[in-house]
Design a protein with these regions (language model features):
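Terminal connector regions
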Residues: 278-279, 286-298, 656, 694-738
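Substrate-binding/catalytic cleft of secreted carbohydrate-active enzymes
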Residues: 349-352, 364-596
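Extended acidic/polar, glycine-enriched regions
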Residues: 142-146, 213-310, 704
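Active-site-adjacent substrate/metal-binding segments within catalytic domains
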Residues: 51-94, 98-106, 111-119, 124-127, ...
Length: 739
């Protein structure tokens, strides 16, 4: 069986692109030889779980658990399946008109270990999993005829030791397959191999770095040519209008059978800034001329934005810029039983990455432990979400030179996306070669972004340290401690007390570079409301072993609300990204959705993020007394003195009224009072308050509504108060539901 499909081709005067996305024949073998017969179909892009009929080991990859067990990590070597070779096959017609052209097959992303055959000739192989692979197929093609393309994709078990492909101790299965676009391009004997448009908004220019690939044969005999003259024309247009705002032609020589580097700068006419609120895009076009003949034309989108740091803060286009958002762990989501083809559904991804985040005032996302298909970045470019882009490096894997090769390819490949503002080389680890040798080298290639090196700080990196990523998981101890009541008496965690510093917070306060808290919480749930593998003890401690999904979700929402308020109240923190916006269900952690993930139905935690992440907000600085067990109850009829904490992430003053409401266990408002507040730009304001507590013992809810001038709806903060000894359970409080 062979897959004969029409292909979609488009030309750009010098380059013709033939898309090979679509349905391919597919099958698996235990040995490294192709199957005699192909019995399945598979979409490209798409991992092996999308094959139909299903692959034989499908149930091993996606078995749903009967219950929750406390598990801290998984050793990848303890596999419960048989590694297989995966074979993608199809035929494509190559027109006779291309016989004088140079043809390349490009696979944007494929994992793990990819070999390509055209008409039974091997044309190349690659161990890279997260960056594009280009294969010269010119010599193997039959023109005016159908051509068989066969792609073998290996298993993670066979990834060579030198490959820059880390492991993730919170993953169990690493699904192989082709997971980004596949296409053929036809050009002349010189072609754009790679290009970077690197903006400087402050200077009003863009620096363009180009690698030109020459396909002329190398010098074989003495006196044969080694180089050929060429011209490269650069043209910058506004993406939406097509108006040309900059143009330049340079001349040079391209070394035969090699890649040649060119660099130039282009001044732009009245450049418009790219920001999350106004994501203005340009198109950068590169045309290569060989003996005055156009032989290739290639274009990319980019944006004019300057992302940098000043002291402990990030800056965007010269202004202080606080990052607010969450994390995406797509490689983990791939092992979700409900993942299916959602990762390649543009509308679903737009809702996940753009619509939902912007609805709650998020402006940023961390692509965590592994990058994403290229169109995800395109969406963030187009709609204005800034990204911290992290390689899959958690547990160490890879030899230095191969890591250098893959990371360099990564910067060239993803470096035109204005949404990517931070390269994240490592997650929660240390690597001296990456931090002190490779990052400075890559900073020379792309000086327009900041590098994060995991847990490496200025102590290990000196002046190479541009930012840190602290992870203040204050509830982590709950995973192991068997005597939690005694633990909290000796190590009190007053959840909601915004003024109290955590013992691990000193390094954040003392650091001299921006601190991006891109993980915190440790309060994950599965989408059915059950605790995750890492948080079973958390919920058992606070709620008991038979808590309902609704009770678990309410605790999670409240906990994350208060921890977010705590972090945002420390204004020296440069950004806060909650963990996690998308991950696999039934795993070690969890995300902010409930029920079927295809519907992206937000959990209560996500709905409360609208308030604690509001750019301008007012929080209650009081410790929780509903769930925490080590605090004494408040005295009935006493005066409660506390602060309201106003925070402002914006470069303009925020002002308005704060309405305080005290509700009893039935939701009845028993008292109100009003305060006025003004918060300076990028500032913090402490507003002292005095509240007369009721004389009746019970469980109460204190709500602060911040009615900001110019904002339609109030921003809420809440605290549960235990007054007297009448309350015996967390159930004896009013459940406040957001509309």
């Amino acid at each position: 069986m062979c897959c004969f499909l029409s292909v979609f081709a488009w030309a750009d005067d010098g380059r013709t692109t033939i898309s090979l996305n679509g349905e391919w024949d597919f099958d698996q073998t235990e040995l490294a030889f192709p199957p005699r017969k192909y019995t399945r179909k598979i979409p490209v892009p798409g991992l092996v779980h999308l094959a139909r009929p299903k692959i034989s080991q499908y149930e091993k990859f996606f078995k749903k658990p009967d219950g929750v067990e406390l598990v801290e990590q998984f050793n990848f070597l303890e596999r419960d399946y048989t590694p297989m070779y995966n074979w993608y096959k199809r035929k494509v017609f190559i027109d006779e008109k291309f016989k004088d052209e140079q043809l390349f097959l490009t696979i944007k992303k494929s994992q793990y270990v990819t070999r390509v055959f055209v008409n039974r000739h091997e044309v190349g192989a690659s161990m890279e999993c997260y960056t594009p692979m280009d294969f010269n197929i010119t010599s193997a093609v039959k023109y005016g005829s159908d051509n068989e393309i066969l792609i073998q994709v290996g298993d993670r078990a066979w990834l060579p030791s030198e490959a820059a492909g880390g492991t993730d101790k919170e993953k169990v299965h690493y699904l192989p397959g082709i997971w980004d676009d596949v296409f053929i391009t036809a050009t002349g004997k010189m072609r754009v191999d790679k290009v970077l448009f690197l903006p400087s908004l402050a200077k009003g220019l863009v620096t363009v770095k180009t690698l030109v690939r020459s396909l002329y044969p190398p010098q074989m005999l003495y006196g044969d040519k080694m180089k050929d003259s060429c011209k490269i024309e650069y043209c910058v247009k506004e993406k939406t209008t097509g108006r040309i705002v900059g143009k330049k032609m340079i001349e040079g020589e391209a070394k035969r059978d090699n890649r040649t580097y060119f660099e130039t700068s282009i001044s732009l006419d009245n450049p418009k800034a790219w920001t999350p609120d106004s994501p203005f895009l340009y198109e950068g076009e590169v045309s290569v001329y060989d003996q005055d003949e156009l032989v290739d034309r290639y274009s990319v989108n980019f944006g004019m934005r300057d992302f940098s740091r000043k002291g402990k803060f990030f800056t965007l286009n010269g202004d202080k810029f606080y990052l607010r958002g969450s994390n995406i762990t797509l490689q983990r989501f791939f092992e979700d039983p409900d993942c299916q083809a959602l990762a390649w559904d543009r509308e679903w991804v737009k809702k996940l990455m753009v619509d939902l985040p912007k609805s709650i005032d998020w402006n940023a996302m961390r692509i965590c432990v592994g990058i994403v298909p290229d169109f995800w970045y395109d969406l963030c470019d187009e709609y204005g979400i800034v990204l911290q882009n992290e390689w899959l490096y958690w547990q160490n894997h890879g030899w230095d030179e191969q890591v250098r090769k893959e990371y360099t390819n990564w910067v060239w490949s993803d470096g035109n996306h204005p949404s990517i503002v931070i390269w994240d080389a490592i997650n929660e680890n240390w690597d001296s070669y990456i931090g002190n040798t490779l990052i400075p080298e890559l900073k020379e290639l792309d000086p327009t972004r900041i590098w994060d090196a995991g847990y490496m700080t200025s102590d290990q990196m000196g002046t190479n340290d541009e930012m840190d990523e602290p992870h203040p998981y204050r509830a982590l101890t709950l995973m192991h401690s068997s005597e939690l009541n005694d633990y909290f008496k000796n190590n009190p965690y007053n959840l909601g007390a915004l003024h109290e510093n955590w013992v691990g917070f000193s390094s954040i306060l003392d650091a001299g570079v921006p601190q991006l808290v891109n993980e915190y919480g440790w309060i994950w749930l599965w989408r059915d409301g059950r605790p995750s593998k890492l948080t079973l003890n958390n919920y058992n401690y606070y709620l008991g072993e038979n808590a309902t999904p609704e009770q678990c979700r309410e605790l999670q929402a409240y906990w994350l609300e208060l921890e977010t308020e705590w972090l945002r109240s420390e204004r020296s923190v440069g950004g806060i990204l909650a963990f996690c916006h998308l991950t696999n269900n039934y795993g070690f952690t969890g995300d902010w959705f409930i029920n079927d993930i295809k519907d992206l139905e937000p959990s209560p935690a996500f709905r409360w993020f609208k308030h604690c992440f509001a750019p301008s907000a007012v929080f209650i600085d009081l410790a929780d007394r509903r769930y925490t067990k080590h605090l004494e109850p408040l005295k009935p009829g006493s005066d409660l003195v506390f602060n309201l904490v106003g925070v402002n992430d914006l470069n303009k003053e925020s002002s308005g009224k704060v309405l305080l409401k005290l509700l009893d266990e039935k939701g009845t408002i028993i008292s109100t009072q009003e305060e006025s507040i003004v918060i300076e730009p990028f500032g913090k304001r402490l507003q002292p308050c005095l509240l007369k507590l009721p004389s009746k013992s019970g469980g109460y809810l204190l709500i602060a509504e911040y009615h900001e001038k110019g904002r339609a709806k109030p921003v809420l903060s809440r605290r549960y108060l235990k007054v007297g000894d009448a309350v015996t359970s967390f159930k004896d409080y009013f459940e406040y539901t957001l509309n």
